[in-house]
UniProtKB/Swiss-Prot annotation:
Summary of the function given for this chain in its UniProt record: Responsible for synthesis of pseudouridine from uracil-13 in transfer RNAs.
PROSITE patterns xref list: TRUD, UPF0024
GO cellular component: cytosol
EC number(s) given by UniProt: 5.4.99.27
Domain TRUD: from-to ranges: 154-302
Protein name: tRNA pseudouridine synthase D
Catalysis: reaction(s): uridine(13) in tRNA = pseudouridine(13) in tRNA
Example GO biological process: tRNA pseudouridine synthesis
Length: 349
């Protein structure tokens, strides 16, 4: 998916700059959203890593603890080209914990280990805290104005380009699969391609809403989500005025679909809008239905929390903020500046 074709909330930036000139310019700290139990058959291990991807570290931990790889889990994938603090979970029923003081892997440091009663699963995170350094910024004034706009109105909650694979290959392969031009047997590839398909359709609908100034305008039949919650409800015609006030106040979010094998969830005017946006995606929709992927919805807009900016000089900005799990830091940066160097790597979940 070409991110350049997606609508900006605050207009295309005039400033350009570089993100991730080095791994230390992109720091991610996982926020579990709960305190480990301190007891149980699972061991949660928090590791700071630099230059290692998530699965590589998980596999290494499994070998170190003499466990089957399936007994080591994590809540989300993180990029290797960054400094990340991430939790891993070792399933140790009736077993002593390995001596992590002897754990050695280049680029990795064990920060803590604590027992827990439940397995850490994909999506278990509450969110992630980011600290980014943006370098060689060409227009400080424009960036400062955009930071104020983002703090007040947020950014489009787009899936970043990394969701679609390098050069958008996951989406390319998904379309070939949908058209029966290739067979996809490997489970992980099937998952990547289906995820890319659904994410692309979410981005497409969200972009159309922004282009028509509908990102915060409630349509009859819209699916609305309480801020910070995953559940949603449908806007009825006789409630539009009240619901519009709640959206404007930030209590409710307008959502767009991650299509699945069920209905989109909207009705009336909103359903017609979404169906029109997806009119040319029939092959991908058929693939998703055939594979029986469960549908869901996601807020169209994203408001970074606890956003703090610190200018080191006129061309270098340190920016920190918190995002809920599944949201992309690069979607925040996209509204701030154009990147001089394309980088398809980022936090994935």
């Amino acid at each position: 998916m070409d991110m350049e074709n997606l609508t900006w909330l605050h207009g295309k930036p005039t400033a350009s700059g570089i993100l991730k000139a080095n791994p230390e310019d992109f720091v991610v700290v996982e926020d579990l959203g709960f305190e480990p139990d301190g007891e149980g058959e699972h061991l949660l291990v928090r590791i700071r890593k630099n230059g290692c991807n998530t699965q590589f570290v998980a596999d290494y931990l499994a070998r170190f603890a003499k466990l089957h790889p399936r007994l080591v889990s994590y809540a989300g994938l993180k990029d290797r080209h960054a400094v990340t603090e991430q939790w891993f979970c070792l399933h140790l029923p009736g077993k002593e914990a390995p001596d992590l003081a002897t754990f050695e892997l280049e680029g990795c440091e064990v920060l803590e280990a604590v027992r827990h009663k439940r397995k850490l699963r994909i999506g278990s995170l509450k969110g992630n805290a980011f600290t980014l350094v943006l370098r060689h910024i060409t227009d400080r004034q424009d960036v400062e104005q955009r930071l104020q706009q983002i703090a007040a109105q947020g950014v489009p909650n787009y899936f970043g380009s990394q969701r679609f694979g390098r050069g958008g290959n996951n989406l390319v392969q998904a379309r070939l699969w949908a058209n029966n031009e290739i067979r996809v047997k490997e489970r992980s590839k099937r998952s990547f391609y289906l995820s890319a398909s659904r994410s692309a359709m979410f981005n497409l609908i969200s972009s159309h809403r922004l282009a028509q100034q509908l990102s915060t305008t409630v349509l009859e039949g819209d699916a609305l989500q309480l801020s910070g919650r995953g559940s949603w409800f449908v806007a009825q015609a006789d409630e539009l005025a009240t619901l519009q006030q709640r959206v404007t106040a930030g209590e409710l979010n307008i959502t767009a679909p991650l299509p699945g094998d069920s209905e989109l969830g909207t009705h009336g005017e909103a359903l017609a809008f979404e169906q029109a946006c997806l009119a040319e995606q029939t092959e991908l929709l058929s693939l998703i239905k055939h594979e029986r992927v469960e549908g869901s919805r996601r807020a169209v807009l994203l408001k970074p929390q606890n956003m703090i900016s610190n200018w080191w000089d006129d061309v270098t900005l340190e920016l920190s903020f918190w995002l809920p799990a599944g949201s992309f830091a690069t979607s925040v940066v996209r509204e701030i500046m154009n990147q001089d160097r394309a980088d398809d790597t980022d936090i994935i979940e």
